[in-house]
């Protein structure tokens, strides 16, 4: 069966989990690229795959069917189901690829792309909140907030006013045209890219989901487990970096303390990747969409 989506940093993910025996949670199963490669590379691995996209779930069930009981697939948001998985499985690894798949971007009816005919952007097609709802019903202050927080857009107020003035906005292309008139031009990417990112994050509550996953891992501290997270923009990467940094701290005394009184034995594990791993030149030539991908890995103590 032809894979519709190239998994990013695949070799680096395989390297991260090559010594694992037991359950790997693929928190963003998607079209099964990372999971299939992990199953092929290591007969001692079992996969629990999670995704909220029903199209991706159907594809991955078929793609991974030959692996039988080595694979369990759950439909849902990873932050909502990870707690139960950590309680019921011997989790030896967690992988999360926090991004939109190529297929989601390329399918115009999903509304993720600036070239889409509609405004949707829901990863879970059954969810109530869509990009259309955000763009056409949020007030000016709400729009300004998500543009500033999730897109780090400097002209968030001006953009919010323009969107409200042009309502109703029916398509992604119409929204992109409005953004193009307001936002500074960029040689590398379309001016509307960060706007679409901000709306997508709001629709899918992506940062809340990421924080929920990390908080659950911190609570359960799965012994010896490796956590590998791929991010595609600075907001997500900052969250992962900060959590890993806090987890690796031995001393938790307040900064103003003159000397350590906590015992300096509070580290949950160690950061495996001192700097984020990025795509190789060869991968970028084959898959330009990997250009902004960053992989960070943490390992909990035994």
From Swiss-Prot:
It is found in: Cytoplasm. It is an enzyme of class 2 (transferase). Its EC number is 2.1.1.199. S-adenosyl-L-methionine binds at residues 32-34, 51, 78, 97, 104. Keywords: Cytoplasm, Methyltransferase, rRNA processing, S-adenosyl-L-methionine, Transferase. Specifically methylates the N4 position of cytidine in position 1402 (C1402) of 16S rRNA. CDD domains: AdoMet_MTases. PANTHER family: 12S RRNA N4-METHYLCYTIDINE METHYLTRANSFERASE, S-ADENOSYL-METHYLTRANSFERASE MRAW. One of its GO terms (molecular function) is rRNA (cytosine-N4-)-methyltransferase activity. Its main location: cytoplasm. This is Ribosomal RNA small subunit methyltransferase H. Belongs to the methyltransferase superfamily. RsmH family. One of its GO terms (biological process) is rRNA base methylation. Pfam families: Methyltransf_5 (PF01795). It comes from the Bacteria.
């Amino acid at each position: 069966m032809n894979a519709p989506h190239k998994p990013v940093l695949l070799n680096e993910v395989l390297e991260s989990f090559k010594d694992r025996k037991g359950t790997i949670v693929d928190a963003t199963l998607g079209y099964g690229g990372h999971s299939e490669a992990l199953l092929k590379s290591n007969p001692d691995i079992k996969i629990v795959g999670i995704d909220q996209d029903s199209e991706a779930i159907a594809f991955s069930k078929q793609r991974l069917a030959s692996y039988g009981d080595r694979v369990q697939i759950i439909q849902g948001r990873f932050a909502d189901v990870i707690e139960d998985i950590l309680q019921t499985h011997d989790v030896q690894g967690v992988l999360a690829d926090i991004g939109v798949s190529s297929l989601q971007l390329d399918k115009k009816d999903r509304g993720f792309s600036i070239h889409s005919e509609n405004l949707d952007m829901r990863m879970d097609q059954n969810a109530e909140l869509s990009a259309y709802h955000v763009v056409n019903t949020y007030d000016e202050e709400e729009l300004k907030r998500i543009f500033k927080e999730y897109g780090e857009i400097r002209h968030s107020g001006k953009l919010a006013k323009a969107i409200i003035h042009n309502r109703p906005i029916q398509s992604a292309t119409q929204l992109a045209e409005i953004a193009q008139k307001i936002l500074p031009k960029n040689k590398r990417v379309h001016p509307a890219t960060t706007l679409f990112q901000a709306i997508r994050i709001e629709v899918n509550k992506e940062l809340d989901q990421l924080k929920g996953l990390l908080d659950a891992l911190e609570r359960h501290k799965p012994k010896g487990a490796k956590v590998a997270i791929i991010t595609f923009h600075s907001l997500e990467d900052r969250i992962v970096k900060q959590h890993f940094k806090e987890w690796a701290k031995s001393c938790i005394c307040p900064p103003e303390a003159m000397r350590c009184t906590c015992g300096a034995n509070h580290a949950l594990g160690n950061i495996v990747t001192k700097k984020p791993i990025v795509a190789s030149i060869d991968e970028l030539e084959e898959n330009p969409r990997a250009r902004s991908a960053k992989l960070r890995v943490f390992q909990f103590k035994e």
